[in-house]
């Protein structure tokens, strides 16, 4: 179709006049007849005429499908667009229309249900809780047995893992006052620390045990046994091996203990006599040297 210019002058009538309802709007042929009419525009306009509200068409690329509110379905747009693009040429869509979408309502309800399940506390009778309580009690007993305080454990962990570990952290773990998630994380750290502490303790005990074997434990002799040994010492200060064995059996002591007692008693007797002689004759040594 060829475009021919008008020979007569264009005529415009105000819209608010009485004759505006009967007279059509005259457009220039270059704006009306020369533009191609697309099928998509025809479909959108025909669909919009069947609805009671204006419909913004939402397209993505060259897809043939159209996202938006269609006739017989109140489904919102898949993508969110700025307000000025959605309202260009059409009034904005009312919010109640979008909020009544059953798909969105089901999704929100499912999301709230999952969030509620996440926030719900764990069952206190679950095996994980019982295992955590058992480890907390065992850790406290083994820590005390090794001779470590809560402060010692907190300082040791803080030196390796950071300042977030302290005596308060260990106290709250042993009293089950931490959250389940944090308690599980701390359990693994404390388990490793406990293993290393027990290894160090075993090496220390082995070293101390070797030193104790070199030096026997000091024996305590009762007063009655001392009196009996003093009487035997007055009678015989150098008893034979058979006499020492007989005295040990009578006093319920070891033979080595009785033998050592007589040796120590003779040494003490010698020191007493030497001290007494020096006190009685202080100048005896000088007198002998002068002679």
Swiss-Prot record:
This is Pituitary-specific positive transcription factor 1. The 9aaTAD motif is a transactivation domain present in a large number of yeast and animal transcription factors. One of its GO terms (molecular function) is RNA polymerase II cis-regulatory region sequence-specific DNA binding. Residues 214-273 bind DNA. Transcription factor involved in the specification of the lactotrope, somatotrope, and thyrotrope phenotypes in the developing anterior pituitary. Activates growth hormone and prolactin genes. Specifically binds to the consensus sequence 5'-TAAAT-3'. One of its GO terms (cellular component) is nucleus. A motif (9aaTAD) lies at residues 5-13. Its main location: nucleus. Keywords: Activator, DNA-binding, Homeobox, Nucleus, Transcription, Transcription regulation. The keyword DNA-binding applies. Belongs to the POU transcription factor family. Class-1 subfamily. Interacts with PITX1. Interacts with LHX3. Interacts with ELK1. Residues 124-198 form the POU-specific domain. GO terms for biological process: positive regulation of transcription by RNA polymerase II. It is found in: Nucleus. The gene is POU1F1. It comes from the Eukaryota.
């Amino acid at each position: 179709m060829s475009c021919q210019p008008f020979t007569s002058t264009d005529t415009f009538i105000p819209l608010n006049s009485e004759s505006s309802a009967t007279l059509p709007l005259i457009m220039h042929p270059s704006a009306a007849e020369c533009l191609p009419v697309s099928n998509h525009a025809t479909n959108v306009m025909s669909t919009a005429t069947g609805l009671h509200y204006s419909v913004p068409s939402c397209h993505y690329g060259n897809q043939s499908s159209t996202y938006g509110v269609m006739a017989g379905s109140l489904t919102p747009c898949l993508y969110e667009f700025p307000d000025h693009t959605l309202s260009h040429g059409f009034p904005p869509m009312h919010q109640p229309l979008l909020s009544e979408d059953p798909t969105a309502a089901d999704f929100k309800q499912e999301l709230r249900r999952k969030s509620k399940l996440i926030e719900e506390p764990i069952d206190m009778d679950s095996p994980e809780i019982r295992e955590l309580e058992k480890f907390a009690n065992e850790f406290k007993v083994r820590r005390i047995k090794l001779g470590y305080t809560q402060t010692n454990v907190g300082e040791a962990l803080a030196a390796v893992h950071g300042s977030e570990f302290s005596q308060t952290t260990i106290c709250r773990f042993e009293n089950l006052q931490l959250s389940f998630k944090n308690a599980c994380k701390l359990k693994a750290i404390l388990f490793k620390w406990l293993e290393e502490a027990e290894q160090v303790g075993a090496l220390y005990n082995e070293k101390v045990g070797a030193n104790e074997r070199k030096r026997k434990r000091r024996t305590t002799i009762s007063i009655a046994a001392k009196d009996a040994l003093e009487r035997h010492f007055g009678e015989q200060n150098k008893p034979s091996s058979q006499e020492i064995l007989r005295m040990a059996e009578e006093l319920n002591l070891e033979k080595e203990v009785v033998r050592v007692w007589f040796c120590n008693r003779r040494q003490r007797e010698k020191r007493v006599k030497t001290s007494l002689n020096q006190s009685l004759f202080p100048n005896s040594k000088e007198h002998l040297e002068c002679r």
